[in-house]
Amino acid sequence: MASLIYRQLLANSYTVDLSDEIENIGYAKSKNVTINPGPFAQTGYAPVNWGPGEVNDSTTVEPVLDGPYQPTNFNPPVNYWMLLSPLNAGVVVEGTNSIDRWLATVLVEPNVTTTVRTYTLFGVQEQISVENNSTTKWKFINLIKTTPPGNFTLYSTLLSEPKLHGIMKHGGQLWVYNGETQTLLLQDYVTSNYDSLTMTSFCDFYIIPRNQESTCTEYINNGLPPIQNTRNVVSVSISSRNIIHNRAQVNEDIVISKTSLWKGVQYNRDIINRFRFANAIIKSGGLGYKWSEISFKPANYQYTYTRDGEEITAHTTCSVNGVNDFSFNGGSLPTDFVISRYEVIKENSYVYVDYWDDSQAFRNMVYVRSLAANLNDVLCTGGDYSFALPVGQWPVMTGGAVMLHAAGVTLSTQFTDFVSLNSLRFRFSLSVEEPYFSITRTRVTRLYGLPAVNPNNDRDYYEIAGRFSLISLVPSNDDYQTPIMNSVTVRQDLERQLGELREEFNALSQEIAISQLIDLALLPLDMFSMFSGIQSSIDAAKSMATNVMKKFKKSKLASSVSTLTNSLSDAASSVSRSSSIRSVSSSVSAWTDVSNQFTDISNSVNSISTQTSTISRRLRLKEIATQTEGINFDDISAAVLKTKIDKSTQIAANNIPDVITEASEKFIPNRAYRVISNDNVFEASTDGRFFAYKVGTFEEIPFDVQKLADLVTDSPVISAIIDFKTLKNLNDNYGITREQAFNLLRSDPRVLREFINQDNPIIKNRIEQLILQCRL
């Protein structure tokens, strides 16, 4: 059974103690060593309390709704809507280019018959005939004249219930809204010298960029957001838009805290990240028609660039992870074209670029926190590669492209021929792009991804612009550099890595095939087979197993087993001292630890629910102690864990102890267990639900806590893989025999596989729900 991995970890905890004891003996024998740490020995220990610090961001975010602004005369910017919000009827806005266009808009309230009103427009009183037949909507009337002494004529109108109107300069024309709310149209005025056209607003107004035109239209249709209609919103002068903001420099060092020999420094840097891929193309022996491998290799690249007038020397290392293996076999003859394996990076792959430069930020990168970075995307396209055959036309692998998207940053170390460099590792996720790649003169075509054959497309490098910010704890003495071998990634960055690993792990639940999962759950997984999916794990399997057991020994499951063992020992001695007393407390306390709760058994549902919930939490331990032939929750948990480890692209050997331990505690939190007595079944779940029912008819019977307590002590505990509600649903919809019912109650894997192979939706849905509960 797959749960053998948990049993093995529980049973071998003593090896961890022995390993620790051996290490302690080794330390004791080698402790008498004289070390001369030099004049800066105190800097080996960092202060506990770090300064608060901040991460500056130079990104300018343009608001969608800018305002409100007070009535004024100004030249509105091009490609920006001026959203007018008058409160009363009358003149709303005037505008002129002082050459051949004088424009004005007046507002008329609802229910106005045709009448002549006097308006002061451009300092002159004008008689304008207006009307508004609408009973609910206000009417904006747009007027125009071409000479100062001329008369205003009607150009367009807008009926608006929220009393909002918009004007914009764009494309050599003046644009306004026309028609009626919910069916709005845009109307343009052709005007010369429109850049210098000034507007005089007689009401509050807002400014909205043209790329948010749909939002402006929504406001005119439905009104401003509620927060804009409160008394706390006060209009300001348009001159406030011209305030000069002093922003932090993008390249600077800020001392944010200083204590004794240490200081916290925030480093902000703009960077130019250049990298290139490397590859290996290996031909097979023979007549020259076969290639054995085309693969990606790590590539170092050194370059210089200018940052704020300073020449920067930078070094990058590019590597890939999660490659996809492809092959092409043209036939079995010695002269048939064959590629045994060629690597392609796709959506499931990652590209790592380790970056270092000679600035102060990388000199003392030992204790680091608040690490953040922003980088642009970059498109990587593949080039052509001709496979030189001795005779005949040469096949050519051509095309392929991926887009690199920044997906995170951590600390790393680069190793060159001469030095080791503390660096930043930028991780990029991939998306496939056009064009696809193909091999000419073969049937390989329309495949997507970037093959390893010519990933740089004859470029010297790919380039990404970006910036990063970090806070580093450095010695106050600027002449001292902390040793590189002490480099550590602080907990914040470790938690970010584990968080990303958890997200990927949980997302893999959708990719697990149920039929294969049942088969895997029946295998006797041990530590070595569990780790087989981790690259280079065979070489470090022994040390990894020890690390896993060290971590697992502190888990809740191991602690519960230890507590249970002590409880059983105490219970046995208690029974021997007082064998005449038989109660719920004496028979079940070792397994349930609820003896105090059972002293006064209540008939209320709440009391029974509390008791059964407490019992069910310990039933997992009883099941581990008395293995049955059926499949259990830990088998499914271990099988899902193994599948996700094999599929994961982010998991590494140092993550295994945390993953194994967390999975044992958190996978399938909602479990139900049952015990069978003749034709009666008692079932209790960790969420407090409980059932008692007959096997043949699934008819519910009264639930007896005392009976359950007695049965738990003497009978095997079975995982309710198919719980009572699922069984009843299955029987009601499909009908099952008594034998099938017994097999499902015993979680018989053979019967489960039969139902799954028949695509039974009820059973498949139950197993899928269990898989979805396997989350970190």
Swiss-Prot record:
One of its GO terms (biological process) is virion attachment to host cell. The record marks R231, N232, R241, N242, R247, A248 as: Cleavage. A motif (YGL motif) lies at residues 448-450. Residues 65-224 are annotated as: Spike head. A motif (KID motif) lies at residues 644-646. Residues 510-776 are annotated as: Spike foot. A motif (DGE motif) lies at residues 308-310. Residues 248-479 are annotated as: Spike body and stalk (antigen domain). Disulfide bonds join C203-C216, C318-C380. It holds the Pfam family VP4_haemagglut. It comes from the Viruses. Keywords: Capsid protein, Coiled coil, Disulfide bond, Hemagglutinin, Host cell membrane, Host cytoplasm, Host cytoskeleton, Host endoplasmic reticulum, Host membrane, Host-virus interaction, Membrane, Outer capsid protein, Viral attachment to host cell, Viral penetration into host cytoplasm, Viral penetration via permeabilization of host membrane, Virion, Virus entry into host cell. Residues 389-409 are annotated as: Hydrophobic. One of its GO terms (cellular component) is membrane. The keyword Hydrolase does not apply. Residues 484-511 form a coiled coil. InterPro entries: ConA-like_dom_sf, Rota_A_VP4, Rota_VP4_MID, Rota_VP4_MID_sf, VP4_concanavalin-like, VP4_helical. Belongs to the rotavirus VP4 family. This strain probably does not use sialic acid to attach to the host cell. This is Outer capsid protein VP4. It comes from Rotavirus A (strain RVA/Equine/United States/FI-14/1980/G3P4[12]) (RV-A). The lineage of its organism: Viruses, Riboviria, Orthornavirae, Duplornaviricota, Resentoviricetes.
